C-alpha cells in the first residue's frame, strides 16, 4: 500500500538516522510508503554491517524532484517505468553492474510476460537515447509490478453486471447514466492517473485522446468539463478502498495491489465468520473460500448468505506499471547499492544462519505482483499442501483442535487457521487478478514537467 508521510517528519527522521550512522556504511533509500517488508531492511543491515535510511515519497514526480534537487543524495530509488525513462533520459542513473561485485540474483530470475512487455515499451520510448550500445535495462531492475483496476461494491443491485460489460469499462467512472441511481463514485487523487482514465473514456467514445501524446488545450478543456460534470463523490487514496468495504462508496479507481490486500483479508474473515457461526465445518472451509471468490460468489446455508461484498474489474487497456530499483549516478556508496538491490530480488539468502526469501516476502507483504516467475509460482503454490504434486490443501480435525487451543490466548487473526486460509486466499487472488502470461494495460507516458503542470491545472480547475 502506497501511503503518505509528512515531509517535515521525513526530514527529521533522515537527519536523526544519518547522525546515528557514524562508523557504519549507510545507504539512503527513496521508496513508497509500506512498500517493503521492513524485517528485510534489518536483515540487510545485519548482513552488511550497515544502516539503511529510508525516505518516502507518494508520487513519481516527487521522486524525480527529490533526486533532481540533490538536497539528499539517495543511493537507491524505486520509481515506476515512465519515471525511470525520464531519469535515464536525463542522465540521472548509474549503470547497474552486478557482475562487478559478483552478484547473481538478477541473472537467476525469469521475468513474467507483463513485465517483459513493459520493458519492451520502455526500450521503445527511449530508443533515441545514445548510450553506446546500452539500453534502459542496464540502468533498472524490476522490483514489483501490477495494474490499476476499478473496485466496486457487489451489494449494489445491477452494478456488477454493468461494470463487467466491457463497453462500460471507463464510462462507469465518468457517465452516471451507466450506473444505478445513487451510485457513489470515487476517483484516485492523482491527476496523472485520472487523466489517463479520462483519455480512455474519450477513446471509447470514438475520439482521439492518445495517452502518449500531449493534448492541445481544447482537449484538456474537454477533460476538465468531463470531470466537473461527473461530480465525483470523493477524491482519495487509501480511504477509497476502506470506504467501499464500509459501504460508504460504491466504485473507485485504484492500484490492484491496494484492492488485493483488503480482498484477501475480507475473504479470510468471511470464511471464519461462517465457521464461528457454525454454518461451516472445518473440512468445508476451503470450499466456502472457493465459493465466495468466484465471480458473483456467495456461500448460502441455513438461510444465510456469505460473500466478500466487493470485487475488482481490470479494463484491458488499463494502466500497467513496474516499479524498479535504480541507483542514482550521485550515489556515494555504489557497491552497497548494488548489494541492496541484489538482496531484495533474491529468492533465498542467509543472514546469521537465518534464511530469508526477500523477493517472495516483499510480494507477499504488500500484495503487489512480482516481476519474477519463480516468486509468482511460489505465491500460487500457497493453496497446495504439496506444491510438487499439486495436491490441494485440506483442513482436518487436527487444524480445528489447534485453533481451539490457540483461541484461548490470542485473537482469531493471530491463529494458524487464519494464516492458512489467508495464504489460500492470496493464492486465489493472485491467480485471478494477476496473470503471468497475459499482457494487460499500458504504462504511463513520461511527459515533461510543463505538460504535467497543465494536467494538474486541468484537474484543479475541474475540482474547484
Identify the residue ranges that each predicted region occupies.
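Alpha-to-beta junction loops
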Residues: 69-77, 92-94, 181-184, 246-254
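Ligand-binding pocket segment of bilobal, Venus flytrap-like solute-binding proteins
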Residues: 186-309
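Mature extracytoplasmic/periplasmic domains
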Residues: 323-438
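Short loop->beta-strand "edge-of-pocket" segments that line small-molecule binding or catalytic clefts
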Residues: 171-191
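C-terminal motif of bacterial Sec signal peptides marking the signal peptidase cleavage site
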Residues: 17-20
Amino acid at each position: 500500500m502506497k501511503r503518505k508521510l509528512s515531509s517535515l517528519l521525513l526530514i527529521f527522521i533522515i537527519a536523526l538516522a544519518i547522525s546515528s550512522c557514524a562508523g557504519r556504511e549507510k545507504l539512503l533509500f527513496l521508496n513508497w510508503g509500506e512498500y517493503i517488508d521492513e524485517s528485510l531492511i534489518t536483515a540487510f543491515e545485519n548482513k552488511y554491517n550497515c544502516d539503511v535510511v529510508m525516505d518516502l515519497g507518494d508520487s513519481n514526480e516527487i521522486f524525480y524532484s527529490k533526486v533532481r534537487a540533490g538536497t539528499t543524495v539517495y543511493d537507491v530509488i524505486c520509481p515506476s517505468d515512465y519515471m525511470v525513462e525520464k531519469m535515464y533520459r536525463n542522465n540521472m542513473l548509474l549503470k547497474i553492474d552486478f557482475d562487478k561485485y559478483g552478484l547473481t540474483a538478477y541473472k537467476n530470475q525469469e521475468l513474467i510476460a507483463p513485465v517483459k512487455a513493459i520493458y519492451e515499451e520502455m526500450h521503445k520510448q527511449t530508443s533515441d537515447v545514445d548510450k553506446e550500445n546500452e539500453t534502459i535495462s542496464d540502468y533498472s531492475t524490476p522490483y514489483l509490478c501490477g495494474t490499476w483496476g476499478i473496485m466496486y461494491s457487489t451489494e449494489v443491485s445491477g452494478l456488477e453486471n454493468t461494470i463487467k460489460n466491457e463497453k462500460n469499462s471507463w464510462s462507469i467512472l465518468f457517465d452516471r447514466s451507466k450506473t444505478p441511481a445513487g451510485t457513489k463514485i470515487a476517483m484516485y487523487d492523482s491527476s496523472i492517473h485520472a487523466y489517463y482514465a479520462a483519455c480512455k473514456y474519450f477513446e471509447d467514445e470514438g475520439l482521439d485522446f492518445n495517452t502518449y501524446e500531449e493534448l492541445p488545450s481544447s482537449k484538456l478543456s474537454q477533460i476538465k468539463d468531463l470531470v466537473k460534470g461527473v461530480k465525483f463523490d470523493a477524491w482519495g487514496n487509501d480511504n477509497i478502498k476502506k470506504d467501499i468495504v464500509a459501504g460508504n462508496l460504491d466504485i473507485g479507481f485504484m492500484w490492484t495491489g491496494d484492492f488485493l490486500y483488503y480482498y484477501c483479508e475480507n475473504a479470510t474473515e468471511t470464511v471464519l465468520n461462517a465457521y464461528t457461526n457454525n454454518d461451516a465445518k472445518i473440512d468445508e472451509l476451503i470450499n466456502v473460500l472457493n465459493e465466495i471468490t468466484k465471480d458473483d460468489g456467495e456461500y448460502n446455508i441455513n438461510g444465510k448468505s456469505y460473500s466478500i461484498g466487493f470485487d475488482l474489474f481490470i479494463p484491458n487497456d488499463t494502466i500497467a506499471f513496474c516499479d524498479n530499483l535504480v541507483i542514482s549516478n550521485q550515489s556515494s556508496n555504489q557497491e552497497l547499492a548494488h548489494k541492496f538491490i541484489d538482496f531484495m530480488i533474491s529468492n533465498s539468502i542467509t543472514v546469521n544462519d537465518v534464511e530469508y526469501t526477500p523477493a517472495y516476502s516483499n510480494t507477499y507483504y504488500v500484495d503487489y505482483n512480482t516481476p519474477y516467475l519463480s516468486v509468482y509460482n511460489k505465491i500460487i503454490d500457497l493453496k497446495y499442501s504439496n506444491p510438487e504434486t499439486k495436491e490441494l490443501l485440506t483442513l482436518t480435525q487436527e487444524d480445528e483442535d489447534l485453533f481451539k487451543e490457540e483461541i484461548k490466548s490470542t485473537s482469531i487473526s493471530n491463529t494458524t487457521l487464519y494464516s492458512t486460509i489467508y495464504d489460500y486466499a492470496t493464492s486465489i487472488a493472485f491467480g485471478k487478478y494477476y496473470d503471468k502470461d497475459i499482457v494487460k494495460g499500458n504504462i504511463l507516458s513520461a511527459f515533461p514537467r510543463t505538460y504535467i503542470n497543465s494536467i494538474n491545472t486541468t484537474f484543479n480547475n475541474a475540482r474547484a
